[in-house]
Amino acid sequence: MKPRATLVLFAAVVVSWMPAVYYGFRLWSVRDVEPSGQKEPDPAFHFVLIAQDVNNPYWRVVYRGAADAAAAHGGAVEFLGPVEANMERHIRLIERSVSAGVDGILTQGLDETTFRPVIDKAIERGVPVVTIDTDAPTSKRLAYVGSDNYLAGVQAGRFMAQATGGVARIGVVTGSFEATNMKQRLKGFEDAIRPFSGMRIVAVESSNISRVRAIEKTALLLNRYPEINALFGASALDGTAMAQVVSGRGRRDVFILAFDDLPETIEWMRKGVIAATVVQEPYRMGYDGVELLLRAARNERLESNYYTATRILTAKEVSSRGPASDGADSGGTEATNADATKIGATGAIATDAGAADADG
């Protein structure tokens, strides 16, 4: 029995040492062998795109353009912003990005008085800032890339006047009463319809860049002012909300002019509910914004404004063509600024929204 017990004990010791022997051999056998795969290189630069609402499909298209441009140069763009428009949170994200030492910032200058100090502080701290979609021209930002929002409003007003025969009672829903781009669009629209005595804006409401609020405000306008027979939505979500309300009420007599060519907007145009929309170039804004930050890093001189084209896209045109892309510039009947400065682009690395925003 004793020899057998000794054999069992020996076997147990051998078994217990087998993992150590195996992994020790593995370590010895690979110590001079190069790894089969290479570590991903660090990005050449780290920019951030800070939007007013990361859930807005329009800003997803802007981000896609920025991400494609960054990838073409071996860099990265992080997409940040509140989940619902909130200027205070937006500004905090700019401040946090500056503190984190990012290489550049693309952001809106939603309200110039509010955003100018934080943009100026970023520049003073050595972080280049390019405004996108909405400018803050009196700030120290390096450049602006985006639509000429006043001209886009003028174009919208002229088109509505022409389409309605110069006679309409108009309800307007704008994304914000404070945002510079929204104020510019509304001012352009008002100036364009002023020569037409039969055109009158009955009331203006704000959706605060919220689909739910846009629906509520549209319903309010139609309930309070039954004479309204035309609607203008000045931000991307307003027109689709108007279409939903008007369609639900069976009001085929209401002329709707929207802003941007989101897939839902295009679908309502196919159904004949939205008559036309003002088309922007969000992808190009994002792409060219990154290109401008890279040019600034090379100490190249930048112009103050780089306007991207805007144009009217009609329901008739949509119905005569194939499916539209999601939010890309769809082409249209008239560019407001065909001679705008163009940058030239070559095109996608990304991190998801809200990574640095504990507030959401």
Indicate where each model-derived feature is located:
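Short, solvent-exposed amphipathic alpha-helices that sit
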Residues: Y58-H73, A152-A156, T180-M199, R213, ...
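Hydrophobic alpha-helical
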Residues: T107-I123, F189, A203, S207-I266
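Hydrophobic alpha-helical segments within soluble ligand-binding/sensing domains
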Residues: V145-R169, R213-I215, T265, Q280-R298
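Hinge/cleft segment of the Venus flytrap/periplasmic-binding protein
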Residues: L7-V13, V21-P35, I193, R284-G360
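Extracytoplasmic "Venus flytrap"
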Residues: F45-R64, A69, H73, E78-R92, ...
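Flexible loop/hinge segments that line or gate small-molecule binding clefts
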Residues: T114-L151, L262-R270
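Short beta-strand elements in bilobed, periplasmic/extracellular small-molecule ligand-binding domains
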Residues: A71-N86, R169-V172, I193-V212
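An alpha-beta-alpha
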Residues: F47, A156-F196, A203-V204, L293, ...
